[in-house]
Amino acid sequence: MMNGQINDLLANIISMYAPQFGRTITKKVALNLAMTAIECQIENTSGDTYALMRTALSECGTILEENIEDGIISEVILSGAANMNPAFLLLKADGTSIHLAVNEKDGLIKQHTAERAIDAFKSAFANAKGS
């Protein structure tokens, strides 16, 4: 997926679902938020990437939307201090790769919400591969 596509999809997800987590964010504002984008290459000998990704996501957060045909899932993981700051994730399974984009908004006190959400996903993904 192109970076512009990721930004646009993530902005749509944030503007639609942020109010459920105590945030009011318009798409225009969401497009201007700082975003951490990470691409992971994952080798799977025990199953397909999408199924493992979905299993991991169901363990560590709340799945918001899912497009099975395109291998795309959007999710929110409560992270940061006391797990009260939402991190919005957009993931795409493509063969053995998972393309991961995370958006979070830290205030004056940095809670490293995006990093913690990524760590939570990676841990859940490792558990899914092991089961």
What do these predicted ranges mean?
Residues 1-131:
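Ser/Thr-rich, low-complexity intrinsically disordered terminal regions
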